[in-house]
């Protein structure tokens, strides 16, 4: 009997303490539902609209935050299979995704590429002739972008290696193109698989994710002048994926699994919620912003911050779905 009691005591801290129900039914007053579908939100430069994806391998959409009207940006593209839409500082768009859907693995990796879409109504996406991995960092101040490459997009890389490329988008000619491409950081193996996230400090620095083995990840940053790299999360053995940065570059949103310390459940990219991390290098100033993972199967993900620091847009998601899949865009109002 004593052995059984000891076993139960040891087991109890790791038991899943999440509650049943839907987090959308118990939202705090500063969070509202914008849409009942969609994923991967992005604020317009004037913070008046939010672009988002209808679904993975789908169309890019745009919601007006004043009228709440929604229009499709890519419905003139037959069988559109885009994964991401992001605003440029000009109000135009960067699209990410394959030119057609083949299968989830190939279309998300080997065939994933960058596109330019003009803000003029009726415009069609234009290929930038650049394959890339996952998402991209798009400057809010200039036409600078950064993106990662893996072996699927760059055969010269060793198996497991990845690199981050920085480039400028040239819109001066008749066809948009990427110029001034240069490698800013490279990982030689799978101990750190790279993904670019956000420029900050007047485009002099870049946040990126270091995806690590066993479902772990770290929040990283690089000074683009000195090339000094900093691990900002400093939390080995846990999942910390940097997302939208706050204006001023002092804080960033992070998809993190830290709540698993008291809620239990498997750590990693499934059981995540949105946290706010101070980029001071200590890894200690971590504040939880959402509590969706308090519910069985629930999580909040893919947060972005408005440039006036008043709002965060994010999505409702499920722990069992692949990263990026969402079921609606929500708006979080920061209170003073």
Region locations from a protein language model:
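N-terminal hydrophobic targeting signals that begin at the initiator methionine
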Residues: 1-2
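Hydrophobic h-region of N-terminal signal peptides that target proteins for export
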Residues: 5-16
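Sequence signature of WD/YWTD-type beta-propeller architectures
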Residues: 16-336
């Amino acid at each position: 009997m004593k052995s059984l009691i000891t076993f139960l005591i040891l087991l109890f801290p790791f038991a899943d303490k999440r509650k049943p129900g839907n987090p959308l039914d118990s939202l705090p007053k500063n969070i509202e539902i914008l849409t009942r579908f969609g994923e991967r939100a992005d604020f317009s430069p004037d913070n008046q609209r939010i672009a988002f994806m209808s679904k993975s391998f789908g169309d890019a959409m745009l919601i007006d935050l004043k009228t709440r009207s929604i229009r499709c940006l890519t419905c003139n593209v037959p069988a559109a299979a885009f994964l991401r839409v992001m605003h440029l500082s000009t109000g135009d768009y960067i699209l990410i995704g394959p030119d057609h859907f083949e299968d989830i693995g190939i279309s998300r990796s080997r065939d994933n590429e960058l596109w330019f879409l003009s803000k003029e109504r009726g415009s069609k996406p234009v290929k930038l002739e650049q394959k890339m991995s996952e998402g991209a960092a798009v400057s809010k101040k200039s036409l600078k972008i950064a993106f990662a490459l893996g072996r699927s997009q760059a055969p010269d890389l060793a198996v497991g290696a990845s690199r981050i490329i920085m480039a400028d988008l040239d819109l001066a000619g008749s066809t948009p193109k990427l110029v001034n491409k240069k490698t800013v950081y490279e990982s030689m193996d799978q101990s750190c698989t790279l993904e670019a996230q956000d420029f900050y400090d007047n485009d002099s620095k870049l946040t990126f994710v270091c995806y690590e083995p066993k479902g772990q990840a770290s929040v990283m940053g690089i000074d683009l002048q000195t090339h000094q790299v900093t691990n900002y999360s400093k939390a080995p053995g846990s999942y910390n994926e940097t997302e939208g940065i706050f204006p001023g570059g002092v804080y960033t949103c992070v998809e993190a699994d830290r709540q698993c310390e008291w809620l239990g459940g498997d750590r990693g990219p499934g059981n995540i919620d949105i946290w706010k991390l101070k980029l001071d290098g200590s890894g200690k100033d971590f504040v939880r912003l959402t509590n969706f993972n308090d519910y069985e199967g629930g999580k909040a993900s893919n947060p972005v911050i408005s440039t006036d620091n008043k709002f965060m847009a994010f999505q409702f998601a499920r722990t069992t779905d692949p990263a990026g899949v969402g079921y609606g865009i929500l708006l979080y109002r920061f209170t003073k």
